[in-house]
Amino acid sequence: IRCQGSNQCYGHCREKTGCPNGKCID
């Protein structure tokens, strides 16, 4: 539920559209 290198992920992690680097963990 968080971005790699960040504390929070925006949008849907599965779509990889909520993370600046495009990588989401959990």
Swiss-Prot record:
Keywords: Disulfide bond, Ion channel impairing toxin, Potassium channel impairing toxin, Secreted, Toxin. Blocks voltage-gated potassium channels. This is Potassium channel toxin alpha-KTx6 OcyKTx1. Has the structural arrangement of an alpha-helix connected to antiparallel beta-sheets by disulfide bonds (CS-alpha/beta). Expressed by the venom gland. It comes from the Eukaryota. InterPro entries: Scorpion_toxin-like_sf (IPR036574), Scorpion_toxinS_K_inh (IPR001947). Pfam families: Toxin_2. Its main location: secreted. It is found in: Secreted. Disulfide bonds join 3-24. One of its GO terms (molecular function) is ion channel inhibitor activity. The lineage of its organism: Eukaryota, Metazoa, Ecdysozoa, Arthropoda, Chelicerata. Belongs to the short scorpion toxin superfamily. Potassium channel inhibitor family. Alpha-KTx 06 subfamily. GO terms for cellular component: extracellular region. This protein elutes at 21.22 minutes.
